[in-house]
């Protein structure tokens, strides 16, 4: 059974800040958001976690291996370098969706995302080191079959994007409802899902569902390990195996 | 009539690079992609353009006011600072979708996105300064009504995200097919669309369509100007008017 | 005669901020400072200016070609993305040192660098476009003869650094007092000086002085143009000529 | 007795790269260098180390607590995100200067800094965890007495800078030769020295020497701990004590 530690990262009171005293230049907001995400990728990633940009003002991270001190350091480092601060809330569950549910509840209990007085919240309990196992995190790395040949090199770029986006929108919803999994678009034709130790049949079912519903053909490599980084790298290698052997689902060995 | 100048930014041969010689660490790829986008936001944004992250390996920019030299400088600056290079292709049309179609065609003609020998392409003709007008770019800035109150402060963050994402997926498709417009999620509950000078009825129709189809309620501020930055800032102010006056569509005066 | 436009960039009330409420983590301060400098390099550099890190909390830029609006945009963009703000003060003079003197005076008149109420000052008048000429900026690019062979590949790195640093400390002082020029270490074994249209004899004299005083052998390429970027690139090519022809001073033709 | 672990970071074959095929735009080189330094500050800093920009193409880090894997990860992460690679060489000694000497020797033995074939070297042995103690690193944080009042708010900014720079050049040389210590300018009026467990008399002597030689008045806070970060933060607090109690040297208790 997996045991996923999820951290919800929320920029404090961000919406109001973006229009105070006047709406701020969009390109500066875009720069701020994407650089904050890049920094979190390094801060969390170099401790073997993964973070996903999600809505940028709310980001979701898989943080198995990061203790409370590591979270506090990340929060402090952001506060020292950005005009905004972040709140962090940690949830743990075999189901990634339930873990994020716990993390969200804790943050909502502390106050609204647009409450000026609710800043730099740090809630939740990381997994104890003694309870960690080598099968705590399952990561599935999907991509689209021959996306470059079928889309990028053929269609208007926006239509390529629509195809990828419809595939993603369908997969994210299906995986959430059928498998308690959290799926994130990570650029190109790639989607990374954090899963509750689901099996080959479940992956095949999701791939079929997306193909039947929106006509986008996916394949997936799956890895299982102690941290998001280790599981994710195993998933990438498994995806390479899919490519070489022309298969739809591969589990890392 | 609008006259949108669109630039397609494509990372050269990116897919193969990400797995050569072995799959690279995902967090480094995420950092690279989001910082490249941040840099383009500044490079293009400080010349009054807008750039959208789209798929990150393919980004779409509105570049009215940027001539060929400005494009060449951006291309050179990226080449000097990243392990990857970018190709740029410029299209101009009253229809943003058609402009991007031209830009895409030009780049596809130059070779595949995964052709090792096709690097740092720069194609297409910017608008001549003498032909530019104060109504060349129409920008529509949408957001979700009370997203914080209805979603962020209530739901599991992933379910908030699913709602925003379904709203976006529906809007992008509808605006593309009905209005030749290009719509981009820009974080939070915000979507920015580059439009072909469409009117209030067309915006109301799109908002109704999204509400009926996926139950997400949008409002929109619309600006028209010489550059994306000026039109976009006007749109933001118009969106503030929607908020204050509780209306669905506002055009900047 | 040159006509250098210099901008002093000063982080507002930075010293007190770094220790409020407690001393902030040094690595975050270093990250903040060097990224702010990197951003200014792009914001100013992509408008054909040069900026030097100097003391990081006070930076000096050569901004021929940047008008007041460009300065205001840079100031706004920093304010939107950093936890600190910057003041900018512009001076113009045939002497770079005198231009910086004017810029400094204007900022000192506005209040102390550690005055909480003195933020985002923007003072001084850029050169009128009609008064700009192709010989407004002289840039001299120095490097150390065979620094890799004599220092980097031979000495303890700190002793290499001491040599470079003593060479720089001597050159900066001499060029300031003898030639009203501003010299900046820019990394490696490179020093860039902004000069008042001085001639070959003055450069040879400075090189001799440094060699005699601290035993560091320099050579220099010199460029003259409308902007720092153009003059600086010409200087780099001239320095390549020094390397190829084994000469001490070369002026770009 | 201190036991400093020093890592020399050297950009591989950087000089030739900056002029190949033609000299690259200086502002892009400045951006690249300062961002690489910022990234290393985070990568090393968030593992409790310190890194100093030194010459930018050669940087010096204090890395007590970073093992070989952490070094390898940093090297890989840079290689994934920059157009250049870095070599890393680790030395350990009670004398910081000797530790850097070892690190430099190892890298020089591997080949020239401008040898195309010598890339991504990783040499040297970090301290074994069992051998680490709470007094391994001594950090001294100097600043200039009333630098804002005497220099920044009074003089031409370049003359302020000359004063700070002369103070630094004198201190770095003296501390290296008298105390085997490595001193680095870190911006503003701040100098951080990595020291070989020297005592109050040695600090007072250095301060007097700088004052007598170049007329710059320094004070210093000193911290001793297991890591650079912990020792450095203690030093900052001790420096605050100097400010409050108007003393020249304070050791953290």
UniProtKB/Swiss-Prot annotation, chains A, B, C, D:
The keyword Lipoprotein does not apply. The keyword Aminoacyl-tRNA synthetase does not apply. One of its GO terms (biological process) is biosynthetic process. It comes from the Archaea. Its EC number is 3.5.4.29. One of its GO terms (molecular function) is GTP binding. Belongs to the archaeal-type GTP cyclohydrolase family. NCBIfam families: PRK02240.1. This is GTP cyclohydrolase III. It comes from Natronomonas pharaonis (strain ATCC 35678 / DSM 2160 / CIP 103997 / JCM 8858 / NBRC 14720 / NCIMB 2260 / Gabara) (Halobacterium pharaonis). The gene is gch3.
């Amino acid at each position: 059974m997996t045991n996923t530690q999820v951290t919800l990262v929320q920029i404090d009171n961000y919406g109001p800040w973006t229009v105070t005293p006047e709406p701020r230049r969009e390109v500066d907001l875009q720069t701020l958001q994407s650089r904050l995400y890049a920094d979190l990728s390094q801060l969390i990633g170099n401790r073997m976690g993964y973070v996903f940009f999600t809505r940028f003002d709310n980001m979701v991270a898989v943080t198995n291996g990061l203790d409370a001190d590591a979270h506090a350091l990340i929060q402090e480092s952001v506060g020292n370098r950005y005009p905004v601060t972040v709140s962090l809330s940690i949830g743990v569950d075999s189901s990634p969706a339930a873990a994020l549910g716990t993390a969200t509840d804790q943050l909502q209990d502390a106050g609204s995302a647009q409450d000026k007085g609710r800043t730099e919240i740090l809630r939740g309990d990381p997994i104890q080191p003694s309870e960690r196992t080598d099968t705590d995190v399952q990561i599935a790395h999907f991509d689209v079959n021959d996306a470059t040949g079928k889309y990028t090199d053929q269609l208007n770029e926006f239509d390529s994007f629509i195809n990828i986006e419809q595939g993603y929108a369908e997969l994210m919803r299906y995986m959430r409802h059928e498998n308690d999994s959290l799926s994130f678009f990570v650029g190109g034709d790639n989607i990374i899902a954090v899963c509750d130790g689901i099996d080959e049949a479940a992956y095949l079912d999701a791939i079929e569902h997306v193909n039947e519903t929106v006509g986008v053909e996916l394949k997936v490599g799956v890895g299982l390990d102690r941290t998001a980084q280790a599981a994710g790298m195993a998933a990438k290698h498994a995806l390479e195996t899919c490519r070489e052997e022309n298969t739809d689902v591969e589990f890392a060995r």
